[in-house]
Amino acid sequence: MVEYVYSVSQDSTNPNAIGFRNELNVAEMKGAIELEATYIDLGRGSLPKLAGSTKIRLRSRHLQAESADEMKGTQRLGSDKAEGKFFMGAIEHDGYLKYNQVRLDSITGITFSVTSAGAGGNIEVRKGAFDGPLLGSVKVEVNGSWDAFHDLHTKVVPSTGKSDLYLVFQNEKNRGGLMNVDWIEFQTKSTQNEK
């Protein structure tokens, strides 16, 4: 079973594996990997060939903030200092980034690449909905720069299965210009053991 894909070449040569069991070696990954399996039998006598195909898409555990499946109260902005040259900024109180169907049972924490020359605030990690169960939170302090990104980490309450994951931005006193977010990275039991 695959927990998270750590690396895949963006310049894929479309590798193929033939047979019932196989292994594909992959290089560094910047996005996601899509695996497709197809089976065609030979048929028999007057019976036609049978075919089946399935495809799955595996998300990297390192995600650009702007790759969110849904967003509110935030804008995609550009900067040479951001990884991938883009980040999410102009973040408002009660704004959020939503990532669809994240496998939560292996996540032990999340690292955020953030910066703030504005109001700062909190990032809440919520399960299933904007106001769903709180899994973790991190306080983003003002560091006086809009592009001096630094890493902050929060532990995540153990959860089960797959669910939509919401990163909700909070600052009731200063409702706009809270922070910028460049990327997020899910920490797992296996990544903790690597350190």
Show where each model-derived region lies.
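Extracytoplasmic
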Residues: 1-195
